[in-house]
Regions:
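Amphipathic alpha-helical hairpins
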Residues: 11, 15, 59, 65, ...
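Helical "substrate-binding/catalytic lid" subdomain
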Residues: 167-287
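NAD(P)+-binding Rossmann beta1-loop-alpha1 motif at the extreme N-terminus of oxidoreductases
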Residues: 1-63, 88, 93-94, 158-159
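Rossmann-fold NAD(P) dinucleotide-binding segment
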Residues: 50-113
Length: 301
């Protein structure tokens, strides 16, 4: 089995690392919050730095917050790049946008280290079950080398090699752009239905059964009905970050996404009302706060 370094053991990274361990891979782990790494000490070696983790592995997997975190962990002081040997491979599964992926890939290429960007779609449940959707960018040889690990972490039928380095990030931004917009549409539709006198259950039954957003309604129904968004599958702050990455990527390509810019502003407003660490569907609570006849309003920050 492959000796794997896993860096970034947050809500998604921890169950993903656990799956690799359960599949029989030798694991060395590192996380900025050391207690997260120590929680896996019974089945993985805990490294003191990214460089140490990289020096003990053939393949490294990163699951980090954003592009800045990726660059710091890989290229910074005591970074992963200093530990990975020539011929090793980094699979970055964070959502960073294409530019950081390409920057890190170029720096690693100069050291003889391969790179694949493989951001995921899915929340904690799919991460634990190994059913994540994965969008992959990188050279054919590197992707094929990564594939056995990706098949442990995700659904092979929903793992797409979409192009060179950075293409996986482009695909992920596309997916979350649509998801963020659909969620706002569902939230506004639900708000309108309630304002016009529909009961919560009737409004949600119709939205789930008759709209193109059926999957979003089904997955968020209980949250919308109760107004409790405190057990996030995907945090609102991260959805906002991904939407901003999409807007920035379009601007870099000399294009604009006016609808997405407005959607991003709504998520920013929800963040400003103290909902950053709630599920991203809490944008519905922010919208409800603009409709004072409704009962669920977000807390003040």
């Amino acid at each position: 089995m492959t000796r794997v370094a896993f860096l970034g053991l947050g809500r998604m990274g921890a169950p993903m690392a656990g799956r690799l361990s359960n599949a029989g891979h030798d694991l060395v782990v590192w996380s900025r919050t050391r207690t997260h790494a120590e929680a896996l000490a019974d089945r993985a070696e805990v490294a003191g730095s990214p460089a140490e983790a990289g020096s003990k592995a053939d393949v490294a997997v990163t699951m980090l917050a954003d592009g800045a975190a990726l660059e710091e962990v890989v290229l910074g002081r005591d970074g992963l790049a200093g530990g990975l040997g020539s011929g090793s491979l980094l699979i970055d599964m964070s959502t960073t946008g294409p530019a950081p992926a390409r920057k890190v890939a170029k720096a690693l290429e100069e050291r003889g280290v391969g790179f694949v960007d493989a951001p995921v779609a899915g929340s904690i449940g799919p991460a634990s079950e190994g059913t994540l959707a994965i969008m992959v960018g990188g050279p054919d040889e590197a992707v094929e080398r990564a594939r056995p690990l990706l098949e442990v972490l995700g659904d092979p039928q929903r793992t797409w090699h979409v192009g060179p380095v950075g293409a996986g990030q482009a695909a992920k931004l596309m997916v979350n752009l649509v998801l963020g917009g659909v969620t706002v549409a569902v939230a506004e539709g639900y708000t309108l239905g309630r304002l016009l006198g529909l009961s919560p259950d009737d409004a949600l039954d119709v939205l789930e059964g008759a709209s193109v957003a059926t999957q979003t309604v089904r997955s968020k129904r209980d949250m919308l009905r109760s107004g409790d968004y405190g057990h996030p599958g995907f945090r609102l702050a991260l959805m906002h970050k991904d939407l901003r990455l999409a807007v920035d990527a379009a601007r870099a390509a000399r294009a604009s996404l006016p609808g997405t810019e407005r959607v991003a502003e709504l998520y920013a407003g929800a963040k400003g009302r103290g909902l950053a660490d709630q599920d991203y569907a809490a944008v519905a609570a922010y919208l409800a706060s603009m409709a004072p006849l409704l009962e669920h309003t977000p807390p003040e920050s």
